[in-house]
Amino acid sequence: LYLAMSLHLDTPRWAAWTVLTVSVPSLDHAFVKSFYRMIGTIVGAAAGIVIVALFAQRPLVFDLAMALWAGACAFVGTRVRQYQSYALALTWLTSGIVSYGSVADPNGAFIVAASRTAEVALGILCAGGAAILFDGHRVATLVHAASPVPGQARRNGVRAGLAVMLASAFWYVSQWQDGPFFVLMSGAAALLFAAHPSKVAATLGMLRGFLLGTLLGLFVRFALFTRSASFGEETLVLLPFLMLGGIGLADSRTQGPATGYNLAFMLAADPANTLSFDLGGALNEAMAMIFGVLVSIGAFLGLVPIRDLLHRDGA
């Protein structure tokens, strides 16, 4: 966070969130996860630039392209190994950050992509350095995701694509100012747990983490931060809340809620060189996060079970 702010990167919170997401107890796992996160970020940034360049002037085609891309990432992510699946989720998330962040100004897509890639790379380097300094043990064999049952990858692709399409339709009709962020969160939640054996439970856990992270992040931003806060003061305020998220990630039983908590907390607290105290904007962004996760839960609960009733063989 200090380096991101010193380098005057646009959104230091993404660098801090990257550290939290790639930090795992084992040095081996940390390096592998960081590698796949970097690959996912680079591919996602490139895909985001291409999608904006091709479809930014055609909103409906743009929404369809993002939905198909989400479905493709979820489909492939279900069929590959654990950290490769994670990379696919981050690929779409980065594509969404670039695409939705620059669709109103397509000429700025490359700048957005470069900024996000730099922030993620900085976070990975910091997490890697910390892993080397404080590594407790090494693990020779990585954990692999269970092989998907026949048809599971296809169903997960449908889930993710339809979640993005439903959110996009609401954004298109309502013209909600934070609609792009709402769509981004709906797709991200659907993809992060696409290959999870208990998708609904995992996503509900993430939602609980989102709620807690949002509340604590807003509390920090509007009650504890001051307009003249130095980096040292911001660090002292943030430290106990970041430690809470890190402890949650270290326990497999709380990784889902901790993932949601860390993302929501960093987005809501929004630490930066120039702090923003726009309460209305912060509440709108918080609503977009929470409703986005609810859309993905609806996709898990409602969209595929109907299909399963018609095709009991799982195909």
Feature-to-residue mapping (PLM):
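A transmembrane helix-and-boundary motif of multi-pass membrane transporters/channels
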Residues: 1-315
